[in-house]
Amino acid sequence: MKTFTLPASVLFCFLLLIQGLGAAPPGRPDVFPPPLSSEHNGQVAEDAVSRPKDDGVPEVRAARNPEPQDQGELFQGVDPRALASVLLQALDRPASPPSVPGGSQQGTPEEAAEALLTESVRSQTHSLPAPEIQAPAVAPPRPQTQDRDPEEDDRSEELEALASLLQELRDFSPSNAKRQQETAAAETETRTHTLTRVNLESPGPERVWRASWGEFQARVPERAPLPPPVPSQFQARMSESAPLPETHQFGEGVSSPKTHLGETLTPLSKAYQSLGGPFPKVRRLEGSFLGGSEAGERLLQQGLAQVEAGRRQAEATRQAAAQEERLADLASDLLLQYLLQGGARQRDLGGRELQETQQERENEREEEAEQERRGGGEDDVGEEDEEAAEAEAEAEEAERARQNALLFAEEEDGEAGAEDKRSQEEAPGHRRKDAEGAEEGGEEDDDDEEMDPQTIDSLIELSTKLHLPADDVVSIIEEVEEKRKRKKNAPPEPVPPPRAAPAPTHVRSPQPPPPAPARDELPDWNEVLPPWDREEDEVFPPGPYHPFPNYIRPRTLQPPASSRRRHFHHALPPARHHPDLEAQARRAQEEADAEERRLQEQEELENYIEHVLLHRP
């Protein structure tokens, strides 16, 4: 087996690159690197020979780490593709046959590598297009024989080493923000210097545009023919080497990616052609990675926003439906309550016929009252009619108050359904109808008056809007009409006894009873000493009137008994001789409040029926 002697040339190229970068900073290509020291070269060569071939990734990354101060800033602002081109050119020279006999065989690869390295460094520091350097002439390969089999093995080993080195170089990217800023600043300075020089030479805008366009064309690489297919082994090694997450950062930090591609693809392709291996096309995946992540995040946010909007819309629809259903139930209950009350103030729904019948009935009553007055009993009959009218009005108000109380109690409950409310409200109507039928004795009117068809149609339409069945509305209307007919033909009800006048409403709180009058009160001028013979019964008064059980009466001048009771009025129990006054005042206050509440509820119900139900289309 032939010994492996390639790492020496590779390390030599590394040293040349390091010294060139240290001597020529970005933007100043006139400074050339100083000569290398033999001691440093030998030390680095020994370290490189002792390093195993497969375990190169940690050491190369450690060499790229800018933190140690003894090694300096390695690969400061260097494109990894340019570095790869230098290494490939250096690896290609030992494999080629010697073109110069004698001692020149050793110096030819070194000179070619140095020239290629200098050109690569200049391409990194200059924004102007660098002239292509022709690859050194390679002698035609000798015919393959069986004696050259070891060389082919060495060639395959070299290709494997090159693939591993390329994998390491692809993983390399300057993640330091400071390094990116320095590289971008150097390129901007170089570009500004170039454009300024062109402007100074020929200030015309056309010349400046041509210079910029020529620079752009020089930077963009020409399309080369497609390379031969990639070997399977090399393709597998390249597919395994995935780019690091910092690759898109490298693309963002560099202002013109085409410049780097144009400067590095040409020497790298020539090096591959000299080795006889294929040249893989370099594709920029940074933008695709970045664009894919941003697009996915944007789509995810849009989807979440759409889901949230749909959820809010469904919630609003559900709340609106619940509100509409609740209002419909309330309106249906109010309509049913109004129909069961008899339609005392029905104007448009009840129709005109009912109002005409009521007007005729009132006219008949007035005529009868006038006839009775003419007969001689005007005063008595007038008083009886007034009392009957008052009694009827009071009975009607009591019935309405009871129904309103039931209605508002059901509205506050809010949990019972419309069917339960309807059944609770229809039951009193049936009971009253049966009671009136029993009192009437089974008499029925033959002349059944039918309601106006328009009124019935309007009621049915209103019931449909209020979620009430049409059959229920028709039955309710028929029951109300039958009740009115029976009430019209029924004998007059007995007049109830007059109700006691309610207490005045201005009394809000019961007044305390007046104090009891003092007994055996002596004049003030005779109050030298208390008359013990006259107050024997008050020395120890009974317990309820004494604030303390162990009270001791002092033997000094005391005020009269009446004044003492005034002092202890807050501790005494309420007077026993006025128990009915407080109860009467309390009852009067409660009745006044109930009457006020009833009138207010009645007024609200009438306003709702007149302004909402009757005017609804």
UniProtKB/Swiss-Prot annotation:
GO terms for cellular component: extracellular region; extracellular space; Golgi apparatus; transport vesicle
PTM annotation (Phosphoserine): residues: 423
Signal peptide extent: 1-23
GO molecular function: growth factor activity; neuropeptide hormone activity
Keywords: Amidation, Antibiotic, Antimicrobial, Cleavage on pair of basic residues, Coiled coil, Cytoplasmic vesicle, Growth factor, Phosphoprotein, Pyrrolidone carboxylic acid, Secreted, Signal
InterPro entries: VGF
GO annotation terms (biological process): defense response to bacterium; generation of precursor metabolites and energy; glucose homeostasis; insulin secretion; ovarian follicle development; response to cAMP; response to cold; response to dietary excess
Coiled-coil annotated residue ranges, if any: none
Compositionally biased tracts (Low complexity): 182-197
Residues recorded with modification Pyrrolidone carboxylic acid: 313
Bias type Acidic residues, positions: 149-160, 378-397, 437-452
Knockout-associated phenotype: VGF-deficiency produces a lean, hypermetabolic mouse that is resistant to diet and genetically-induced obesity.
UniProt feature, compositional bias: Pro residues: 491-501
Protein name as it appears in the record: Neurosecretory protein VGF
Taxonomy of the source species: Eukaryota, Metazoa, Chordata, Craniata, Vertebrata
